[in-house]
Design a protein with these regions (language model features):
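Extracellular/lumen-exposed scaffold segments
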Residues: 34-303
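A subset of signal/propeptide-processing and intrinsically disordered low-complexity segments
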Residues: 6, 31-32
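Bacterial N-terminal signal peptides
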Residues: 16-29
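N-terminal secretory signal peptides that target proteins for export/translocation
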Residues: 1-14
């Protein structure tokens, strides 16, 4: 089995699908088992994980079934996004051994930034998260059986590596559809540079949501600096995360310049953490802007 990871894992304990995804081809045909709505919880110290089943995706030329990885954490505990930030390790889903599964796409809901306890910041989820899955079966006429080995780190007053083994038979008729759809709403939408998201529900937006207006590079002390202009509804809190074109890029977390809660915000970060011989000019970055009610993902090529 091979896995294609779209976002970087930081080599020095710093680590971002289109629409945020792992795409994992797997194989085999399912044996006769009853489809389920959810697996049993795998409960461990300070956390528990399970698989949940949803419905078939409508309007697709091929059969695609929704599912999800649900992780619960003790109050105040956290786990990590695909790019964990200054410290941490992202979840590592492995679907090898699944039956009647051609591929699995993992979607990543918008994360948040939090102190890592060592003077830096991590990126991830507090208390609870559902990672939506899109399952493509090998044989659309048969049900599928997911087998997931999930490695993930959790942190509270200490950090603990966790490994869960989960199984779930699915057929596109699961009862956890609403929970999965709610998580999918928070998955950043892919839009072009300068293009705003369509978020009529954002208060004060007038129907206009987030937009990343411009990205440019300028000389800095020791490293070039990237300047990102973000448009957002006035007073809406916004954060920004930056990822490189390959997993060995380890970009710093962007910082908001001058505070500001107006319709235009400026974020900056140094071009630090590049792999040896990497060229910044022409590199394609992935920028993710997140507010309380909206999230977008923008591919942006450096000048």
């Amino acid at each position: 089995m091979t896995a294609f990871v779209t976002k970087p894992v930081r080599e020095r304990l710093r680590s971002t699908i289109v629409a945020a995804l792992f795409c994992v081809p797997v194989g085999g045909l399912v044996s006769a088992v009853w489809a389920q709505d959810a697996s049993e919880w795998d409960a461990q110290n300070h956390t528990a994980a399970r698989l949940i089943a949803g419905s078939q995706v409508a309007g697709s030329d091929t059969k695609i079934v929704r599912a999800g990885v649900e992780i619960k954490l003790d109050p105040g505990w956290k786990t990590y996004w695909r790019d964990p930030g200054d410290s941490g390790v992202p979840p590592k889903p492995d679907f090898a051994g699944s039956d009647n599964v051609k591929s699995v796409t993992v979607l990543w809901p918008a994360p948040e930034r939090f102190p890592d306890g060592a003077g830096g910041n991590s990126i991830g989820y507090l208390d609870h998260v559902i990672l939506p899955l899109r399952i493509t079966p090998q044989d659309a006429k048969e049900q599928s059986s997911l087998k997931l080995k999930l490695g993930y780190d959790i942190c509270g007053n200490m950090c603990v590596p966790v490994e869960s083994d989960l199984k779930l038979a699915i057929n596109g008729d699961g009862a956890e559809e609403m929970a999965i759809e709610k998580a999918e709403i928070r998955v950043p939408r892919r839009v072009a540079l300068g293009e705003g998201s369509d978020t009529k529900g954002v208060k004060g937006s007038g129907g206009k949501g987030l937009a990343i207006l411009s990205v440019h590079r300028e000389p800095g002390d020791g490293h070039d600096r990237v300047i990102v202009e973000v448009s957002a509804p006035a007073s809406a809190p916004v954060d920004l995360f930056a990822e490189g074109p390959t997993p060995d890029w380890s970009l710093p977390l962007p910082e908001l310049k001058g505070g500001g809660n107006g319709p235009s915000r400026q974020f900056t970060f140094d071009l630090d953490g590049l792999p040896p011989d990497a060229q910044a000019k022409g590199a394609m970055l992935i920028l993710t802007a997140v507010s309380d009610d909206d999230a977008i993902e923008v591919p942006a090529r450096l000048d």
